[in-house]
């Protein structure tokens, strides 16, 4: 896998108010006052198939809203083998764990051509404390990720996961 440097993936800044999938993403419920709290640019980025969005253990620069494509989250075992832990689709949040830890706990790789918005951690922390709308949406996304993991574990334990 060839890593993609952030500079080559950057396509400009995003206009979150005009996003075509805004109703699916973290900023779905924000109002004009909430948008006024955003004091850093939201980066519009694109990655080709196999593009590395971030590596396991990297210091987090932000969280990513997946606008188009699919991303796999991969963890490495102690002996160097890789395991896919989740596949994310449009509307999902990539790197959500960084809000709690400041680091990414897996590697994020584009499964096809991917478009994401990178939201700086500072923006997320500021909005989550000052906007109940973002805080509620963030809790919904955490719950969706947890439910997906729980469902997968249940399928694995009951024999339907392949």
Language-model segments: what does each one mean?
Residues 1-162:
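Cytosolic regulatory regions built on CNB/CRP/Popeye-like sensor folds
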């Amino acid at each position: 896998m060839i890593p993609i440097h952030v500079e080559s993936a950057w396509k400009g800044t995003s206009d979150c108010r005009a996003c075509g999938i805004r109703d699916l993403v973290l900023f779905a419920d924000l109002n004009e006052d909430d948008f006024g709290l955003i004091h850093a640019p939201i980066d519009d980025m694109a990655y080709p198939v196999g593009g590395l969005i971030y590596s396991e253990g990297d210091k987090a620069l932000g969280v990513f809203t997946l606008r188009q494509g699919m991303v796999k989250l991969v963890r490495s075992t102690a002996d160097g083998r890789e395991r896919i832990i989740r596949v994310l689709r449009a509307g999902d949040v990539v790197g959500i764990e960084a809000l709690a830890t400041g680091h990414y706990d897996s590697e994020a790789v584009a499964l096809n051509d991917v478009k994401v918005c990178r939201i700086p951690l500072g923006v997320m922390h500021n909005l989550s404390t000052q906007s109940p709308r973002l805080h509620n949406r963030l809790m919904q996304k955490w719950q969706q990720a947890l439910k997906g993991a729980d469902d997968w574990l249940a399928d694995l334990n009951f024999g339907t996961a392949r």
